[in-house]
Every structure is written in C-alpha cells, then in structure tokens.
Amino acid sequence: MLRFRNILAAVSAVLLLGLASSYMPIATAGDLPTEKGCKTLKEADSVMKGWCAAITRRKGNCLSCHHAIVDNWPETLPPGGNIGPPFVAMGARFPNSEDLRAQIWDATAKNPNSSMPPFGKHKLISEKDIDNIVAWLSTL
C-alpha cells in the first residue's frame, strides 16, 4: 500500500509540474495598454485591437462583466467583473471562432434569458470590433 501511495504521489507531482509549465501568458510586460494607451496605438494587430475593444467603455467593455486571466494587467485598469463567465480556456470552449462570434453578436439567440447585450444585433459595436474581440479571446 505504501508503494502505491508513493507512485501516486510521484505521478501527481509530474502532472502538476506539467500543468504549471504549460501556462503561457498572452502578453509580456508593458504589452497591454490601458484604455488611454489604446487611443495612441498606431499599429496594432487584431489581437491587440480586440484587447482594446474589450476594455474600452465606448466599445465592448467586456471586462466590466467578465474576468480575464492575463499577465501584466494594467495597474490603472479595474479588475474584471463577475457577472458573466470568466474568459478562461476560450479556445477550448469555442474551438470554432464563428460560434464565439455568434455568442458576442447575439447571446440571446442561444439563451433568451442572457444578461449579455446583443452587441452585433443592436449595433452596439462594429462588426470589425467583434472580429477583433474574437481574435483576442481566442488567445486566452
């Protein structure tokens, strides 16, 4: 029985180390701008534009309801919300980016009781902003 416990402990330790080493942040120090910093970005890829749309109050403002786990969260940015589900393992949860896009475009299509506004259906944000938010979320 003791041998079994030792083997179990060793296997558990290896699995935990494997999980810990597989964590990869989406950005490095200084890469994630604040809302003010987003306004001054000259060249940004769709992922960075998606981050900016997600934190900008006049655009998606996704992080007012959702929490995202990212490294180097800007100090002046309030923590994410807890109304909607957290942005964790988004690529695994939505392997088809069109499903994620449809959820942002109109969450009430799948769940009429959803508290998430139908951003695309009501034209709250542009189609391009939705595409950029999907690009950013797919990195999480």
Where are these regions (language model features)?
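Gly/Gly-Pro-rich "capping" loops immediately C-terminal to redox-active cysteine motifs
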Residues: 63-105
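C-terminal capping alpha-helices of c-type cytochrome domains
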Residues: 98, 102-111, 120-140
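Electrostatic cytochrome c docking/interface patches
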Residues: 27-58
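N-terminal export/targeting leaders of redox proteins
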Residues: 1-37
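Short pre-active-site segment immediately N-terminal to redox-active cysteine/selenocysteine motifs
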Residues: 57-61, 69, 129
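Substrate-binding/catalytic groove segments of enzymes
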Residues: 74, 109-114
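Short sequence/structural segments immediately N-terminal
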Residues: 47, 57-59, 110-111, 140
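Methionine-biased hydrophobic packing positions in alpha-helices, especially
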Residues: 116-118
